Amino acid sequence: MTQKTNSILTPDMKAMVGKTGEKVDAWGVVDEEYLRRFAQAIPDWDPLYWDKDLAQKSKFKGLTVPPLLPTYIVTRRALSEKDQMDEVMVQDPMNDGGMNSGGGTRSQKGMLPRLPLPPHIKRHLHGGDDVEVHQYPRMGDKITFQRKYTSIQERIGGDGKPFLVARSETTYWNQKGEVLCKVGTIDIRR
């Protein structure tokens, strides 16, 4: 005998597919300091990022930067902008700043509207990312990004309880409107 479950995927949630966050211009441009910090963090010491002669002879015909650098740049804030994590940490010093934290990255510009989840759905699991690189960013590029929901599906877990799989995509452009990369993200809600 199979257990009958009530669907948690409501018409309001289905209507979220295709919804977008605001289109946002990142603060600053791709520069040597962003490159240095990102290359040290991942670590990636490709000489195409700093050796002008070698880079000029490459297929890129000049210096380039790691293809995922736009995903880092958009998290930066101008010094004049309030950091929302300050307030979150006062309220809850153990907060990790995650998407369900009531602050932190959720308050970042360009975020998607919150899913209208039932009250019993409280857990969030990052299900992974996939990346589609169109072209490498260049020094001086001004990055713009926008997120959108691409699908929201209901699944049944091994315990017989329903959960949601929400997929979103973030597109990153340069100042010429050329797509640099697209990052698909899977979020699991239980």
Q: Where on the chain are the PLM-derived regions?
A:
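Hot-dog-fold acyl-thioester-processing enzymes
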Residues: 2-128
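HotDog/MaoC-like acyl-thioester-processing domains
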Residues: 1-23, 125-190
